[in-house]
Amino acid sequence: MFQFCLFLVLLTLGRINSALGSNHESDAAENREGSGGLPVCRENAICAFLQQNAIDSKVTPLPTCTCSGGNTCSESWNEDGKSLTMGSKQFKFCSNVPESVKHNCDAEEKAFTAIFEEDKETKKHLAYYGFLHCICPEDSDYVEIDKPEKEEGDKLIRTENFRCEKLKTCGANDRCHSLAIGGDRQIVYRECNCPEGKQCPFDPESAYDTEHKVTTTDYTTYLMRCQ
């Protein structure tokens, strides 16, 4: 199951092949039209993703593209008309949230589209664009529907479409979530919901296992089971 939060974190850090097993690997995005190594946003693309840390309520901002035309992308948690909140997550837009997004996702509806551009020969990552189509419930995750590819000149364009799927109830040996901590970034990767009477811990000392990966930032991932 694709987990959107961590995917965006490691894209922003410059490497999508994460400690949690995402399949994409890339160098830092480069696009001369943008700033900070990010491409210029396409119309209606999300410009940033925020997650509120369950440990200390700190907000981690993850910019994905650069706004143009005098627009700016807020990296603060707020309700400014350009933000869409889903539980502990907030998606940011360069302008007002598109009206077409403001509804709950149906079971088979396309919920999110991710577009990757890379150099056809070198496989170097060039750009990423994310598009919300509807609102996923907080207890849901994104499941891939399809992944078409096409070539445009010297670029390979990969489009990945996702729908919402309700998180299952954790079994006795299931990982309920993983806590990825690197530098000042702390991101939760949810995998299932704990059964009644149990909770998924956030204290790193409660982890049953740890993994350490180096991207452009050192990341330690703490793997948790329900307690």
Swiss-Prot record:
Q: What is its main location?
A: secreted
The record's tissue-specificity note reads: Expressed by the venom gland.
GO molecular-function annotation terms? toxin activity
Signal peptide residue numbers: 1-21
Q: Where in the cell is it found?
A: Secreted
What GO cellular-component annotations does this UniProt entry give? Answer: extracellular region
Q: Posttranslational modification, per the record? A: Contains 8 disulfide bonds.
Give the top-rank taxon of the lineage listed in the UniProt record for this protein.
Eukaryota
Q: Which UniProt keywords apply?
A: Disulfide bond, Secreted, Signal, Toxin
Family, as annotated: Belongs to the scoloptoxin-11 family.
- In Swiss-Prot or TrEMBL terms, this protein is called U-scoloptoxin(11)-Sm6a
The organism named in the record is Scolopendra morsitans (Tanzanian blue ringleg centipede)
